[in-house]
Protein backbone atom coordinates (compact mmCIF):
# COMPACT_ATOMS: atom_id res chain seq x y z
CA UNK A 1 0.00 0.00 0.00
CA UNK A 2 1.22 3.48 -0.83
CA UNK A 3 2.13 5.72 2.12
CA UNK A 4 2.86 9.43 2.35
CA UNK A 5 4.84 10.97 5.22
CA UNK A 6 4.28 14.65 5.93
CA UNK A 7 7.17 16.27 7.81
CA UNK A 8 6.40 18.85 10.51
CA UNK A 9 5.12 22.15 9.09
CA UNK A 10 6.20 25.35 10.84
CA UNK A 11 3.89 27.79 9.03
CA UNK A 12 1.08 27.90 6.44
CA UNK A 13 0.15 30.78 4.18
CA UNK A 14 -1.52 31.18 0.81
CA UNK A 15 -4.68 30.92 -1.25
CA UNK A 16 -6.39 27.69 -2.30
CA UNK A 17 -8.86 27.58 -5.19
CA UNK A 18 -11.36 24.91 -4.20
CA UNK A 19 -12.49 22.10 -6.48
CA UNK A 20 -16.24 21.97 -7.16
CA UNK A 21 -18.52 20.52 -4.50
CA UNK A 22 -19.17 16.77 -4.80
CA UNK A 23 -22.81 16.94 -3.67
CA UNK A 24 -23.54 19.95 -5.91
CA UNK A 25 -21.77 18.35 -8.90
CA UNK A 26 -23.77 15.13 -8.82
CA UNK A 27 -27.10 16.84 -8.09
CA UNK A 28 -26.47 19.25 -10.99
CA UNK A 29 -25.66 16.44 -13.44
CA UNK A 30 -28.79 14.48 -12.52
CA UNK A 31 -31.12 17.50 -12.71
CA UNK A 32 -29.53 18.56 -16.02
CA UNK A 33 -30.10 15.05 -17.41
CA UNK A 34 -33.79 15.08 -16.44
CA UNK A 35 -34.43 18.70 -17.48
CA UNK A 36 -35.69 20.04 -20.77
CA UNK A 37 -32.91 21.84 -22.65
CA UNK A 38 -29.11 21.82 -22.58
CA UNK A 39 -27.26 22.75 -19.39
CA UNK A 40 -23.63 23.82 -19.20
CA UNK A 41 -22.36 22.71 -15.79
CA UNK A 42 -19.18 24.64 -14.87
CA UNK A 43 -16.55 24.13 -12.12
CA UNK A 44 -17.59 20.47 -12.06
CA UNK A 45 -15.55 18.33 -9.68
CA UNK A 46 -13.26 15.80 -11.36
CA UNK A 47 -13.45 12.86 -8.94
CA UNK A 48 -14.45 9.21 -8.55
CA UNK A 49 -18.01 10.00 -7.39
CA UNK A 50 -18.68 12.32 -10.32
CA UNK A 51 -17.17 9.84 -12.77
CA UNK A 52 -19.57 7.15 -11.52
CA UNK A 53 -22.53 9.50 -12.04
CA UNK A 54 -21.36 10.44 -15.56
CA UNK A 55 -20.85 6.78 -16.51
CA UNK A 56 -24.35 5.92 -15.26
CA UNK A 57 -25.95 8.79 -17.19
CA UNK A 58 -24.17 7.71 -20.39
CA UNK A 59 -25.52 4.15 -19.97
CA UNK A 60 -28.98 5.66 -19.48
CA UNK A 61 -28.81 7.37 -22.86
CA UNK A 62 -27.87 10.89 -21.76
CA UNK A 63 -25.64 12.74 -24.22
CA UNK A 64 -23.02 15.08 -22.81
CA UNK A 65 -19.63 16.52 -23.72
CA UNK A 66 -16.90 16.98 -21.14
CA UNK A 67 -14.11 19.57 -21.45
CA UNK A 68 -10.53 18.30 -21.56
CA UNK A 69 -9.88 19.27 -17.93
CA UNK A 70 -13.27 17.73 -16.99
CA UNK A 71 -14.43 20.94 -15.26
CA UNK A 72 -17.18 21.79 -17.78
CA UNK A 73 -19.91 19.39 -18.85
CA UNK A 74 -22.56 20.23 -21.42
CA UNK A 75 -25.57 17.99 -20.77
CA UNK A 76 -28.38 17.49 -23.27
CA UNK A 77 -31.42 17.04 -21.05
CA UNK A 78 -33.88 14.25 -21.77
CA UNK A 79 -36.87 16.35 -20.66
CA UNK A 80 -38.40 13.15 -19.31
CA UNK A 81 -37.69 10.12 -17.10
CA UNK A 82 -34.91 7.66 -17.89
CA UNK A 83 -35.57 4.56 -20.00
CA UNK A 84 -33.28 1.55 -20.41
CA UNK A 85 -32.90 -1.89 -21.95
CA UNK A 86 -33.97 -4.73 -19.64
CA UNK A 87 -31.05 -6.14 -17.62
CA UNK A 88 -28.86 -3.02 -17.59
CA UNK A 89 -26.54 -2.86 -14.54
CA UNK A 90 -25.02 0.37 -13.20
CA UNK A 91 -21.84 0.11 -11.10
CA UNK A 92 -21.64 3.14 -8.78
CA UNK A 93 -18.46 2.43 -6.79
CA UNK A 94 -18.80 3.86 -3.28
CA UNK A 95 -20.61 6.99 -4.47
CA UNK A 96 -23.54 7.61 -2.13
CA UNK A 97 -24.19 10.87 -4.01
CA UNK A 98 -24.86 8.78 -7.14
CA UNK A 99 -26.54 5.70 -5.60
CA UNK A 100 -29.24 7.47 -3.57
CA UNK A 101 -30.50 10.06 -6.11
CA UNK A 102 -30.36 7.58 -9.01
CA UNK A 103 -32.33 4.99 -7.03
CA UNK A 104 -35.20 7.48 -6.73
CA UNK A 105 -34.89 8.94 -10.23
CA UNK A 106 -34.91 5.51 -11.89
CA UNK A 107 -38.24 4.72 -10.19
CA UNK A 108 -39.82 7.40 -12.43
CA UNK A 109 -39.37 5.22 -15.52
CA UNK A 110 -42.74 4.38 -16.96
CA UNK A 111 -43.80 0.99 -18.26
CA UNK A 112 -45.67 2.44 -21.25
CA UNK A 113 -43.03 0.52 -23.12
CA UNK A 114 -41.79 -2.99 -22.38
CA UNK A 115 -41.33 -3.93 -18.69
CA UNK A 116 -37.62 -3.56 -17.90
CA UNK A 117 -35.43 -4.06 -14.84
CA UNK A 118 -32.23 -2.21 -13.95
CA UNK A 119 -29.64 -3.19 -11.33
CA UNK A 120 -27.69 -0.76 -9.14
CA UNK A 121 -24.55 -2.08 -7.50
CA UNK A 122 -21.18 -0.88 -6.22
CA UNK A 123 -18.03 -1.66 -4.23
CA UNK A 124 -18.19 -3.94 -1.15
CA UNK A 125 -18.48 -0.90 1.18
CA UNK A 126 -21.54 0.30 -0.77
CA UNK A 127 -23.24 -2.96 0.20
CA UNK A 128 -22.80 -1.95 3.87
CA UNK A 129 -24.30 1.54 3.45
CA UNK A 130 -27.99 1.58 4.40
CA UNK A 131 -30.64 2.57 1.87
CA UNK A 132 -33.74 1.09 3.53
CA UNK A 133 -35.33 4.42 4.54
CA UNK A 134 -35.23 5.63 0.94
CA UNK A 135 -36.52 2.36 -0.50
CA UNK A 136 -39.35 2.25 2.09
CA UNK A 137 -40.42 5.74 1.01
CA UNK A 138 -40.24 4.87 -2.71
CA UNK A 139 -42.36 1.75 -2.15
CA UNK A 140 -45.01 3.91 -0.44
CA UNK A 141 -44.98 6.13 -3.55
CA UNK A 142 -45.72 3.13 -5.77
CA UNK A 143 -42.24 2.13 -6.95
CA UNK A 144 -41.04 -1.45 -7.53
CA UNK A 145 -37.63 -1.83 -5.84
CA UNK A 146 -36.11 -5.11 -4.64
CA UNK A 147 -33.02 -6.00 -2.64
CA UNK A 148 -30.76 -8.50 -4.41
CA UNK A 149 -28.62 -9.47 -1.40
CA UNK A 150 -29.05 -8.16 2.14
CA UNK A 151 -32.36 -6.46 2.93
CA UNK A 152 -31.92 -2.72 3.49
CA UNK A 153 -28.70 -2.44 1.45
CA UNK A 154 -27.59 -2.32 -2.21
CA UNK A 155 -27.44 -3.95 -4.72
CA UNK A 156 -30.98 -3.11 -5.85
CA UNK A 157 -33.23 -4.07 -8.75
CA UNK A 158 -35.73 -1.45 -9.98
CA UNK A 159 -38.61 -2.08 -12.41
CA UNK A 160 -40.06 0.62 -14.65
CA UNK A 161 -43.51 0.78 -13.05
CA UNK A 162 -43.43 4.56 -12.54
CA UNK A 163 -43.69 6.65 -9.36
CA UNK A 164 -47.26 7.45 -8.34
CA UNK A 165 -46.63 10.02 -5.58
CA UNK A 166 -49.17 10.46 -2.77
CA UNK A 167 -48.49 10.51 0.97
CA UNK A 168 -45.07 9.25 1.96
CA UNK A 169 -43.33 8.98 5.33
CA UNK A 170 -39.54 8.96 5.47
CA UNK A 171 -37.13 8.58 8.37
CA UNK A 172 -34.94 11.68 8.53
CA UNK A 173 -32.65 10.57 11.35
CA UNK A 174 -29.87 8.71 9.50
CA UNK A 175 -29.04 10.59 6.30
CA UNK A 176 -30.44 13.65 4.55
CA UNK A 177 -29.43 12.06 1.22
CA UNK A 178 -32.54 9.83 1.36
CA UNK A 179 -34.83 12.87 1.51
CA UNK A 180 -32.76 14.68 -1.15
CA UNK A 181 -33.20 11.71 -3.50
CA UNK A 182 -36.97 11.59 -2.91
CA UNK A 183 -37.38 15.36 -3.29
CA UNK A 184 -35.51 15.41 -6.60
CA UNK A 185 -37.68 12.63 -8.08
CA UNK A 186 -41.04 13.83 -6.68
CA UNK A 187 -41.83 16.62 -9.21
CA UNK A 188 -41.87 14.03 -12.01
CA UNK A 189 -44.19 11.61 -10.16
CA UNK A 190 -47.70 11.09 -11.56
CA UNK A 191 -49.42 12.87 -8.66
CA UNK A 192 -48.53 15.38 -5.97
CA UNK A 193 -46.27 14.00 -3.24
CA UNK A 194 -46.61 14.89 0.43
CA UNK A 195 -43.52 13.85 2.37
CA UNK A 196 -43.75 13.60 6.14
CA UNK A 197 -40.49 13.42 8.12
CA UNK A 198 -40.32 10.86 10.92
CA UNK A 199 -37.83 11.66 13.69
CA UNK A 200 -35.39 14.56 13.74
CA UNK A 201 -34.12 15.54 10.28
CA UNK A 202 -30.30 15.43 10.18
CA UNK A 203 -28.04 17.70 8.12
CA UNK A 204 -30.76 20.27 7.26
CA UNK A 205 -28.32 22.49 5.31
CA UNK A 206 -27.91 19.69 2.77
CA UNK A 207 -31.69 19.78 2.20
CA UNK A 208 -31.43 23.54 1.66
CA UNK A 209 -28.87 22.86 -1.10
CA UNK A 210 -31.30 20.45 -2.78
CA UNK A 211 -34.29 22.82 -2.59
CA UNK A 212 -32.15 25.70 -3.84
CA UNK A 213 -30.96 23.69 -6.84
CA UNK A 214 -34.45 22.41 -7.69
CA UNK A 215 -35.59 26.05 -7.77
CA UNK A 216 -32.77 26.92 -10.20
CA UNK A 217 -34.13 24.11 -12.42
CA UNK A 218 -37.65 25.70 -12.16
CA UNK A 219 -39.29 23.53 -9.49
CA UNK A 220 -40.61 24.89 -6.18
CA UNK A 221 -41.18 22.80 -3.06
CA UNK A 222 -43.45 23.77 -0.16
CA UNK A 223 -41.18 23.23 2.86
CA UNK A 224 -43.29 23.20 6.04
CA UNK A 225 -40.63 23.72 8.71
CA UNK A 226 -38.65 20.61 7.65
CA UNK A 227 -41.47 18.43 9.03
CA UNK A 228 -43.43 18.12 5.80
CA UNK A 229 -42.61 18.82 2.16
CA UNK A 230 -45.30 19.12 -0.54
CA UNK A 231 -44.22 18.69 -4.16
CA UNK A 232 -46.59 19.11 -7.11
CA UNK A 233 -46.49 16.17 -9.52
CA UNK A 234 -46.28 15.94 -13.31
CA UNK A 235 -43.77 18.79 -13.53
CA UNK A 236 -40.79 19.19 -15.80
CA UNK A 237 -37.38 20.48 -14.80
CA UNK A 238 -36.19 23.32 -17.07
CA UNK A 239 -32.53 23.91 -17.86
CA UNK A 240 -31.11 27.16 -16.40
CA UNK A 241 -28.67 27.07 -19.40
CA UNK A 242 -25.63 27.46 -17.12
CA UNK A 243 -25.10 26.09 -13.62
CA UNK A 244 -21.95 27.06 -11.69
CA UNK A 245 -20.88 24.49 -9.10
CA UNK A 246 -19.61 26.23 -5.96
CA UNK A 247 -16.27 25.26 -4.48
CA UNK A 248 -16.56 22.37 -2.01
CA UNK A 249 -17.10 23.88 1.45
CA UNK A 250 -16.23 20.55 3.13
CA UNK A 251 -12.89 20.57 1.30
CA UNK A 252 -12.34 24.16 2.45
CA UNK A 253 -12.35 23.01 6.07
CA UNK A 254 -8.84 21.45 6.02
CA UNK A 255 -7.20 24.62 4.72
CA UNK A 256 -9.16 26.95 6.99
CA UNK A 257 -8.22 24.77 9.96
CA UNK A 258 -4.55 24.88 8.92
CA UNK A 259 -4.72 28.68 8.84
CA UNK A 260 -6.39 28.76 12.26
CA UNK A 261 -3.66 26.52 13.71
CA UNK A 262 -0.52 27.90 12.09
CA UNK A 263 -0.78 30.90 9.81
CA UNK A 264 -3.21 32.51 7.40
CA UNK A 265 -5.06 30.78 4.55
CA UNK A 266 -7.72 32.00 2.14
CA UNK A 267 -10.00 29.61 0.22
CA UNK A 268 -11.80 30.82 -2.92
CA UNK A 269 -14.91 29.42 -4.60
CA UNK A 270 -17.08 29.62 -1.49
CA UNK A 271 -18.07 32.72 0.51
CA UNK A 272 -20.61 34.32 2.82
CA UNK A 273 -23.53 33.71 0.42
CA UNK A 274 -22.71 30.06 -0.25
CA UNK A 275 -25.67 27.65 -0.30
CA UNK A 276 -23.56 24.98 1.43
CA UNK A 277 -24.03 24.45 5.14
CA UNK A 278 -20.40 23.46 5.60
CA UNK A 279 -19.41 27.14 5.20
CA UNK A 280 -20.53 27.34 8.87
CA UNK A 281 -17.38 25.37 9.75
CA UNK A 282 -15.60 28.74 9.72
CA UNK A 283 -17.92 29.96 12.49
CA UNK A 284 -16.90 26.98 14.63
CA UNK A 285 -13.22 27.88 14.12
CA UNK A 286 -14.10 31.44 15.15
CA UNK A 287 -15.75 30.15 18.34
CA UNK A 288 -12.54 28.25 19.07
CA UNK A 289 -10.51 31.46 18.74
CA UNK A 290 -9.43 31.78 15.09
CA UNK A 291 -9.77 35.07 13.18
CA UNK A 292 -12.18 34.65 10.25
CA UNK A 293 -12.79 37.04 7.34
CA UNK A 294 -15.78 36.51 5.00
CA UNK A 295 -15.80 37.70 1.38
CA UNK A 296 -18.30 37.25 -1.47
CA UNK A 297 -16.18 34.49 -2.99
CA UNK A 298 -13.69 33.64 -0.25
CA UNK A 299 -13.23 32.76 3.41
CA UNK A 300 -9.98 33.47 5.23
CA UNK A 301 -8.78 31.95 8.50
CA UNK A 302 -5.93 33.33 10.57
CA UNK A 303 -4.18 31.87 13.57
CA UNK A 304 -5.65 32.54 17.00
CA UNK A 305 -5.32 31.01 20.48
CA UNK A 306 -7.57 27.96 20.03
CA UNK A 307 -9.73 26.61 22.87
CA UNK A 308 -11.69 23.36 22.96
CA UNK A 309 -15.47 23.49 22.46
CA UNK A 310 -18.51 21.34 23.28
CA UNK A 311 -20.97 21.52 20.41
CA UNK A 312 -23.78 19.81 18.49
CA UNK A 313 -22.43 19.49 14.93
CA UNK A 314 -25.29 17.62 13.28
CA UNK A 315 -25.66 20.49 10.79
CA UNK A 316 -22.09 20.11 9.44
CA UNK A 317 -21.30 16.37 9.69
CA UNK A 318 -18.53 16.25 7.05
CA UNK A 319 -16.71 19.40 8.16
CA UNK A 320 -17.12 18.39 11.82
CA UNK A 321 -14.51 15.68 11.22
CA UNK A 322 -11.98 18.45 10.65
CA UNK A 323 -12.84 19.88 14.08
CA UNK A 324 -11.81 16.52 15.58
CA UNK A 325 -8.23 16.88 14.31
CA UNK A 326 -8.19 20.66 14.90
CA UNK A 327 -9.00 19.82 18.54
CA UNK A 328 -5.48 18.36 18.83
CA UNK A 329 -4.19 21.95 18.77
CA UNK A 330 -6.72 23.51 21.18
CA UNK A 331 -6.45 24.13 24.92
CA UNK A 332 -8.73 21.77 26.87
CA UNK A 333 -11.12 19.09 25.68
CA UNK A 334 -13.43 19.19 22.68
CA UNK A 335 -16.75 17.32 22.46
CA UNK A 336 -18.50 16.89 19.10
CA UNK A 337 -22.13 15.81 19.60
CA UNK A 338 -25.09 14.46 17.63
CA UNK A 339 -22.97 12.90 14.88
CA UNK A 340 -24.42 9.38 14.71
CA UNK A 341 -24.54 9.72 10.91
CA UNK A 342 -20.70 9.56 10.88
CA UNK A 343 -21.26 5.82 11.32
CA UNK A 344 -22.99 5.35 7.94
CA UNK A 345 -20.54 7.28 5.75
CA UNK A 346 -17.63 5.95 3.63
CA UNK A 347 -16.52 4.09 6.77
CA UNK A 348 -17.73 4.13 10.40
CA UNK A 349 -16.12 7.52 10.93
CA UNK A 350 -16.73 7.70 14.68
CA UNK A 351 -14.85 4.49 15.34
CA UNK A 352 -12.12 5.31 12.78
CA UNK A 353 -11.58 8.84 14.11
CA UNK A 354 -11.31 7.65 17.73
CA UNK A 355 -8.81 4.92 16.81
CA UNK A 356 -6.52 7.19 14.78
CA UNK A 357 -6.64 10.16 17.22
CA UNK A 358 -5.43 7.84 19.99
CA UNK A 359 -2.46 6.82 17.82
CA UNK A 360 -1.18 10.41 17.68
CA UNK A 361 -1.46 10.84 21.45
CA UNK A 362 -4.97 12.10 22.21
CA UNK A 363 -7.22 10.69 24.93
CA UNK A 364 -10.54 9.87 23.29
CA UNK A 365 -13.98 8.74 24.42
CA UNK A 366 -16.14 7.35 21.62
CA UNK A 367 -19.87 7.49 22.38
CA UNK A 368 -22.77 6.18 20.32
CA UNK A 369 -23.25 9.62 18.74
CA UNK A 370 -20.44 11.79 20.15
CA UNK A 371 -16.67 11.97 20.47
CA UNK A 372 -14.72 13.55 23.34
CA UNK A 373 -11.10 14.54 22.64
CA UNK A 374 -8.41 15.52 25.14
CA UNK A 375 -5.41 16.71 23.09
CA UNK A 376 -1.82 15.70 23.85
CA UNK A 377 0.58 18.36 25.16
CA UNK A 378 2.21 20.19 22.24
CA UNK A 379 5.47 18.24 22.70
CA UNK A 380 3.75 14.88 23.23
CA UNK A 381 2.46 14.14 19.71
CA UNK A 382 3.40 10.65 18.50
CA UNK A 383 4.48 9.79 14.96
CA UNK A 384 1.80 7.40 13.69
CA UNK A 385 0.75 5.60 10.54
CA UNK A 386 -2.82 6.71 9.94
CA UNK A 387 -5.18 4.13 8.45
CA UNK A 388 -7.58 5.90 6.09
CA UNK A 389 -10.22 3.15 5.63
CA UNK A 390 -10.64 4.10 1.95
CA UNK A 391 -12.22 7.31 3.27
CA UNK A 392 -11.07 10.55 1.62
CA UNK A 393 -11.98 12.68 4.65
CA UNK A 394 -9.88 10.61 7.07
CA UNK A 395 -6.80 11.19 4.89
CA UNK A 396 -7.40 14.93 4.61
CA UNK A 397 -8.26 15.46 8.30
CA UNK A 398 -5.10 13.78 9.52
CA UNK A 399 -2.84 15.85 7.25
CA UNK A 400 -3.33 18.54 9.93
CA UNK A 401 -1.27 16.47 12.40
CA UNK A 402 1.83 17.63 10.46
CA UNK A 403 1.21 21.12 11.92
CA UNK A 404 2.60 19.71 15.19
CA UNK A 405 6.30 19.09 15.90
CA UNK A 406 5.90 15.48 14.71
CA UNK A 407 5.65 13.91 11.26
CA UNK A 408 2.55 11.93 10.27
CA UNK A 409 2.27 9.06 7.78
CA UNK A 410 -0.94 8.75 5.76
CA UNK A 411 -1.73 5.29 4.36
CA UNK A 412 -3.35 5.14 0.91
CA UNK A 413 -3.21 8.93 0.30
CA UNK A 414 -4.80 8.50 -3.14
CA UNK A 415 -8.17 7.78 -1.50
CA UNK A 416 -8.69 11.58 -1.62
CA UNK A 417 -9.57 11.06 -5.31
CA UNK A 418 -13.19 10.65 -4.19
CA UNK A 419 -13.52 14.43 -3.80
CA UNK A 420 -10.10 16.09 -4.06
CA UNK A 421 -7.47 14.29 -6.18
CA UNK A 422 -4.92 17.14 -5.83
CA UNK A 423 -5.37 17.63 -2.07
CA UNK A 424 -1.82 16.83 -0.94
CA UNK A 425 -0.31 19.03 -3.69
CA UNK A 426 -2.48 21.95 -2.56
CA UNK A 427 -1.65 21.27 1.09
CA UNK A 428 2.10 21.26 0.50
CA UNK A 429 1.81 24.45 -1.60
CA UNK A 430 0.68 26.49 1.44
CA UNK A 431 3.12 24.81 3.86
CA UNK A 432 6.57 25.92 5.01
CA UNK A 433 8.52 23.07 6.58
Swiss-Prot record:
InterPro entries: Enolpyruvate_Tfrase_dom (IPR001986), Enolpyruvate_Tfrase_sf (IPR036968), EPSP_synthase (IPR006264), EPSP_synthase_CS (IPR023193), RNA3'P_cycl/enolpyr_Trfase_a/b (IPR013792). SUPFAM superfamilies: EPT/RTPC-like (SSF55205). One of its GO terms (cellular component) is cytoplasm. GO terms for biological process: amino acid biosynthetic process; aromatic amino acid family biosynthetic process; chorismate biosynthetic process. PROSITE patterns: EPSP_SYNTHASE_1 (PS00104), EPSP_SYNTHASE_2 (PS00885). Phosphoenolpyruvate binds at residues 22, 96, 129, 177, 349, 393, 418. Keywords: Amino-acid biosynthesis, Aromatic amino acid biosynthesis, Cytoplasm, Transferase. The keyword Cytoplasm applies. Coiled coil: none annotated. It is found in: Cytoplasm. Its main location: cytoplasm. The active site is at 318 (proton acceptor). It is an enzyme of class 2 (transferase). Pathway: Metabolic intermediate biosynthesis; chorismate biosynthesis; chorismate from D-erythrose 4-phosphate and phosphoenolpyruvate: step 6/7. Signal peptide: none annotated. Pfam families: EPSP_synthase. It catalyses: 3-phosphoshikimate + phosphoenolpyruvate = 5-O-(1-carboxyvinyl)-3-phosphoshikimate + phosphate. Its EC number is 2.5.1.19. It comes from the Bacteria. Belongs to the EPSP synthase family. PANTHER family: AROM/DEHYDROQUINATE SYNTHASE, PENTAFUNCTIONAL AROM POLYPEPTIDE. Catalyzes the transfer of the enolpyruvyl moiety of phosphoenolpyruvate (PEP) to the 5-hydroxyl of shikimate-3-phosphate (S3P) to produce enolpyruvyl shikimate-3-phosphate and inorganic phosphate. Monomer. This is 3-phosphoshikimate 1-carboxyvinyltransferase. It comes from Mannheimia succiniciproducens (strain KCTC 0769BP / MBEL55E).
Amino acid sequence: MEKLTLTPISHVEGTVNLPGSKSLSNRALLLAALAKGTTRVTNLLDSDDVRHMLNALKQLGVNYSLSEDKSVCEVQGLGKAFAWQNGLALFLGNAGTAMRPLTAALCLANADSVPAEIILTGEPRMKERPIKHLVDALLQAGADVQYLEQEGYPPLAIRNTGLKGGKVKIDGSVSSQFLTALLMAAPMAERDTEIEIIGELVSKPYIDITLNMMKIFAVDVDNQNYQRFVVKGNQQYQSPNIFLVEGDASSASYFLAAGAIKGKVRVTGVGKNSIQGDRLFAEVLEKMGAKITWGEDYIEAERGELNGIDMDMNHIPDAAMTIATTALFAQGETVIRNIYNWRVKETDRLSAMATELRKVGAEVEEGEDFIRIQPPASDQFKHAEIETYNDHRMAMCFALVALSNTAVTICDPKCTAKTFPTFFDEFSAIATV
